[in-house]
C-alpha cells in the first residue's frame, strides 16, 4: 500500500505529531487486538492531526475520540481501525461511508485503495473535509445529504460503514449492499451500543455478528448547512 505523494509529504509532523508518536499509537492498536497490517500501516501514514482543530493537535495521536464541532467527534483510532479491519476482510473495492465527519475515516479507506463514497448531513463539516481531501491529494466522492437513505446511484457497494448509531440497522442501506458485501455499524441507544457486522452471503441471505461494545453519536435525520 502506497499513499499518494502529497499525503506522504503532509504526513510529516513534529513533536506530538511526529512519526515516533504515531508509531506508539500503532503499537497500542496492535496490543489491543488490531491485526491487519494494511490497516495499521495506513493509520501510521494518514496525518490525523490535520483532521482536527489545531488547538487539539497535541492530542491527535492519543487513542481517544476528539470533538470536531456541531456535536460530532472524530472517532477513537482503535474504533476506526476495528471498523476498517472488519470491512477489509471481504476485500472490498467500493465502499459507502455514512457520516463523513472530519474526513479521517474516509481518508483511511481511500488510502487503502478503496473507491470511497461518503455522505455527510452537516454542510460545514463536509466542506472542511473536502478541503482536507484536496490538500492531501485524496480522491473521494462525497455529497451533502441525509445518510440514512444511502447513495442509490452508485449501489451496490462491497462494503458500507456507518459512523453514527441508529436504534436498528437501516433496511435502505442493507438493500444497497452487494452479494458478498459487509456492513459495519454501531447499533443501539445513547446509553448502550454495540458494533454490529452484517454480511450478505453468496446465496443472498444475511448474517449478523456483534463485534464490540462502543459509544457513537446518534445518527440523525435531515440536513444542516
Swiss-Prot record:
Q: What is its EC number?
A: 2.1.1.77
Q: What's a Gene Ontology MF term here?
A: protein-L-isoaspartate (D-aspartate) O-methyltransferase activity
Gene Ontology biological-process entries: methylation; protein modification process; protein repair
Keywords, ordered alphabetically: Cytoplasm, Methyltransferase, S-adenosyl-L-methionine, Transferase
- Would the keyword Methyltransferase be found if you checked this record's keyword annotation? yes
Cellular compartment(s)? Cytoplasm
Which PROSITE patterns does the entry mention? PCMT
Q: Which residues form the active site?
A: 75
What function does this protein fulfil?
Catalyzes the methyl esterification of L-isoaspartyl residues in peptides and proteins that result from spontaneous decomposition of normal L-aspartyl and L-asparaginyl residues. It plays a role in the repair and/or degradation of damaged proteins.
| Listed name of the protein | Protein-L-isoaspartate O-methyltransferase
What gene is this protein a product of?
Answer: pcm
Amino acid at each position: 500500500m502506497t499513499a499518494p505523494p502529497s499525503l506522504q509529504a503532509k504526513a510529516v509532523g513534529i513533536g506530538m505529531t511526529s512519526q515516533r508518536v504515531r508509531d506508539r499509537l500503532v503499537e497500542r492498536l496492535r496490543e489491543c487486538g488490531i491485526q491487519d497490517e494494511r490497516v495499521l500501516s495506513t493509520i501510521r501514514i494518514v496525518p490525523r492531526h490535520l483532521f482536527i482543530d489545531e488547538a487539539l493537535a497535541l492530542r491527535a495521536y492519543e487513542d481517544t475520540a476528539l470533538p470536531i464541532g456541531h456535536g460530532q467527534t472524530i472517532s477513537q483510532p482503535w474504533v476506526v481501525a476495528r471498523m476498517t479491519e472488519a470491512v477489509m476482510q471481504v476485500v472490498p473495492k467500493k465502499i459507502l461511508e455514512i457520516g463523513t465527519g472530519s474526513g479521517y475515516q474516509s481518508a483511511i479507506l481511500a488510502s487503502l485503495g478503496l473507491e470511497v463514497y461518503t455522505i455527510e448531513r452537516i454542510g460545514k463539516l463536509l466542506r472542511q473535509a473536502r478541503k482536507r481531501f484536496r490538500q492531501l491529494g485524496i480522491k473521494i466522492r462525497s455529497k451533502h445529504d441525509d445518510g440514512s437513505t444511502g447513495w442509490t446511484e452508485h449501489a451496490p457497494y462491497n462494503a458500507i460503514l456507518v459512523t453514527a448509531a441508529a436504534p436498528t440497522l437501516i433496511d435502505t442501506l442493507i438493500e444497497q449492499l452487494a452479494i458478498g458485501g459487509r456492513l459495519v455499524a454501531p447499533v443501539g441507544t445513547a446509553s448502550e451500543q454495540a458494533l454490529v457486522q452484517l454480511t450478505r452471503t453468496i446465496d443472498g441471505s444475511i448474517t449478523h455478528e456483534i463485534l464490540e461494545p462502543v459509544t457513537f453519536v446518534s445518527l440523525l435525520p435531515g440536513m444542516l448547512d
